[in-house]
Regions:
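A short helix-loop-beta-strand connector motif used in the catalytic cores of GNAT acetyltransferases and
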Residues: 41-54
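Conserved GNAT-fold acetyl-CoA-binding loop/helix
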Residues: 18-43
Length: 143
């Protein structure tokens, strides 16, 4: 079941992000990797800046999260993570479809250039690499 996150979900969102972000260890630039990958303060700051999370719950346990943030002309997909033990079950797809369905603007997604699995995931869902003047570490996607 997909639902909007509530304040009570904060710790679970924090834990899912940091569990799933382990996949980036050794992949992203070393100066960008740290543990936890995202601190509570960073997560709180993103939420205060307008990231609205949706959660996928399985038997009342949140196993996947994905955020969307309104940025004038576009909506940004932010922090798309599924618990490591729950990957490859279609949860990310369901969350992405839900956010796309609710978007009224073009969607932009940024990910690490070296995260080829993430790039393939978004390409499978109709996104394409956008022409970019953004640093080579990350590549944006555009619907």
């Amino acid at each position: 079941m997909i639902r909007k996150a509530t304040d009570e979900d904060f710790e679970e969102i924090f834990n899912i992000i940091n569990d799933a972000a382990i996949a980036y260890k050794g992949v992203i630039p070393p100066d960008r990797w740290h543990e936890p990958y995202m601190t509570r303060e960073e997560l709180r700051s993103h939420i205060e800046d307008g990231v609205r999370f949706s959660c996928y719950a399985d038997d009342d346990e949140i196993v996947g999260v994905m955020g969307i943030q309104d940025k004038s002309d576009v909506a940004l997909i932010r922090h798309a993570y599924v618990r490591t033990k729950q990957r490859n079950k279609g949860i990310g797809t369901l969350l992405l479809q839900e956010l796309i369905k609710g978007a009224s603007k073009p969607i932009l997604i940024g990910t690490w250039k070296a995260a080829d699995w993430a790039i393939r995931f978004y390409e499978r869902h109709g996104f394409r690499l956008a022409a970019s003047s953004i640093p080579a570490r990350s590549l944006p996607f555009l619907v």
